[in-house]
Amino acid sequence: MHRRIVVVMSLLLLAAACGMLTGLLVAPVWAQGRGWTKVPAITVVAPENDPRLPATHQAIEFWNRTFAELGTPFRLGSVTQVTDTIPPDYLQTLSAQVLSRAGFPDFPEQIQKLPGDLLVVLSEGDFVSFCARSRSGGKVLVGIKSHHMYPLTLPNVMPNLIAHELGHAIGLGHNSDATTLMCGRPAPCRPDAFQSYTKRFFPLTDQDKILLGRMYPTDWSSR
């Protein structure tokens, strides 16, 4: 009897560690290979004239050009802007939890009620920009730190940083090649590596393109 209790408790602890005991957890979007099964509608949460809006649209266009070049019908969807404010303290906490790769409570109602599937939050907070996925409602949230903070003040960094986080949102993970878009932890490259006085998006690796082809094949369709 004692052995049976130990086994059951061990399984419960394992399930808790894997986020299996509750469906109300947010998952850090680091692991690669989880693609969209529909065209995600995008909602940008930002002040009306936020200077990061052009970089956000450029990053979305970069990915849609990439999908066209790969021959897949998948695209990032229509873009809507709302001027709601997500508390910077919440985004800072969420960023820290994503970095720790831990499960955490699902997005609050303020976020869940926002329109769209993919939320790009242009914040005034100071945190590590991140991407997180809701396990309950299917929303993905990309949090972008203040444009007044280093290294987002450097030329060419902002559009590449947003494109990098959108890369996570569409299913790509990190690599260790600092000359490419998806380089990131645990490799030492950070967003300042995107600095350039020539406007350009950093490239994808061949492996990134192979993975995108698997997630979004030429016969991809919404389901």
Predicted regions: what they are:
Residues L53, H57-A169, G173:
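Metzincin-family zinc-dependent endopeptidase catalytic domain
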Residues W30-F62:
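Fold-level signature of zinc-dependent metallopeptidase catalytic domains
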Residues M9-L24:
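Bacterial N-terminal signal peptides
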Residues G23-A31:
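Signal peptide processing junction and immediate N-terminal pro/mature segment
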Residues M1-R4:
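Positively charged n-region of N-terminal signal peptides that target proteins for export
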Residues A41, G71-P73, L181, R223:
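Residues at or immediately flanking beta-strands
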